Amino acid sequence: MTKTADLKGSNFTLSVLHLPNDDVALALNMLEQKVAQAPSFFASAPVVVNIENVSNEINFVELKSGVERTGMIPVGITGCKDKEKQAQATAAGFAIMTSFTPQQVTQKANMQPTKVIKTPIRSGQQIYAKDADLVILNHVSPGAEVIADGSIHIHGTLRGRAIAGASGQAEAKVFCKNLQAELISIAGNYWLSDQIDKEYWHQNVMITMVEDRIQIDTLTL
């Protein structure tokens, strides 16, 4: 029996660039700076642009090329009900995307046994625990990346990037003994190092998602 192409609906975690005002050039400059802090994380990553707070006319061709210059891939716009703007965005190659409140992705029933790594994670290395939690019994160096579909436990210093809930599980957590991260992410929501309050720097912490926002708590144990 010949197989045919099948079109199905699915859910993906996408980054959203929120334009805070009419200064699109400033927002693109900010995006470029953020990408420069973690280029491997953002490289070729799809991004949606929210233009809800932009009241002036937008040059969508320039907006698209500006995002592409950062190395990210602009796939669509959201926050726009103006039909004329939608037509201009479509002509520039953007998809029109409707905002919605996603249902929380629950932990998979077929989670695999926890992946345990005893050696240091060195710069340039990437460790991925597919459908599992990840335990690192050592340090994570700058430029290294640890990823898990579940939670991440680092029994050492986190100087690289930790990406938990990679498949969208918002209940995933990141634990580390000494927080000095380049980037932390849970279910597609991320903070770069300059977004982490200094009170948590060098601390034993738990990182969670609370009401769609990353939260950091210090641990005393």
Swiss-Prot record:
Gene3D superfamilies: 2.160.20.70, 3.30.70.260
Lineage top rank: taxon: Bacteria
Keyword Cell cycle: yes
Protease as UniProt keyword: no
Keywords on record: Cell cycle, Cell division, Septation
GO annotation, biological process: cell morphogenesis; division septum assembly; regulation of cell division; regulation of cell septum assembly
InterPro entries named in the record: CAP/MinC_C (IPR016098), MinC (IPR013033), MinC_C_sf (IPR036145), MinC_N (IPR007874), Septum_form_inhib_MinC_C (IPR005526)
Protein family (similarity comment): Belongs to the MinC family.
Oligomer status and interactors: Interacts with MinD and FtsZ.
Described purpose of this protein according to its UniProt entry: Cell division inhibitor that blocks the formation of polar Z ring septums. Rapidly oscillates between the poles of the cell to destabilize FtsZ filaments that have formed before they mature into polar Z rings. Prevents FtsZ polymerization.
Protein name, UniProt field: Probable septum site-determining protein MinC
Organism: Aliivibrio fischeri (strain MJ11)
